[in-house]
């Protein structure tokens, strides 16, 4: 459901080690204030783990902007292969115990892959980039090359979803026998 930053502030102190939360609710679709939660956690000395599985199909997660310690999503929900994707910040990765063979411990990209990568699945991840690059070429007349391009694509996707969602919400408002979890209003 909905996460409220003011409620979280009351719970976070120096004893909190990890704040794990969804980027977006899988139930009501509300996008949570990821950047603010990550900032609050850092102030308290806690790590963050953001579950992006419900958000990633609706936009490109701006991991550099949010600064989470861990960000996870399923690539099959973003036009990719059936594969889990995990980002781990360099600062956290150096603190975690290596899960690989001893001779790979010094390689950040190998530390958490004990059996080695599934090369076919990893190669198929390139299709996600191709999809977004095609969107960028078609709608923005530019190649996928910068964070501003990602921002424009996020806006493009979001605006299309809002356009499709508004008539549905307007219709549901007229139905007295339906209870909507979440808001009838489309938030930015």
Walk through the language-model features, giving the residues of each:
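Pyridoxal 5′-phosphate
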Residues: 1-188
């Amino acid at each position: 459901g909905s996460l409220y930053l003011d409620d979280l502030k009351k719970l976070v102190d120096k004893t909190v080690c990890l704040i794990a939360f969804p980027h977006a609710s899988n139930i009501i679709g509300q996008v949570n204030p990821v950047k603010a939660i990550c900032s609050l956690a850092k102030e308290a000395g806690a790590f963050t783990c953001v579950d992006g599985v419900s958000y990633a199909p609706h936009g490109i997660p701006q991991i550099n902007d949010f600064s989470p310690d861990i960000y996870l999503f399923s690539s099959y929900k973003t036009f990719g292969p059936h594969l889990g994707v995990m980002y781990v910040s360099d600062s956290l990765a150096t603190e975690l115990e290596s899960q690989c063979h001893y001779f790979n411990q010094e390689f950040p990209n190998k530390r958490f892959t004990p059996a080695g990568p599934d090369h076919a699945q990893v190669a198929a991840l390139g299709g996600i980039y191709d999809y977004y690059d095609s969107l960028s070429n078609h709608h923005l007349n530019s190649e996928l090359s910068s964070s501003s391009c990602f921002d424009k694509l996020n806006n493009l996707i979001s605006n299309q979803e809002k356009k499709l969602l508004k008539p549905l919400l307007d219709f549901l408002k007229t139905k007295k026998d339906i209870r909507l979890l979440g808001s009838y209003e489309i938030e930015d």
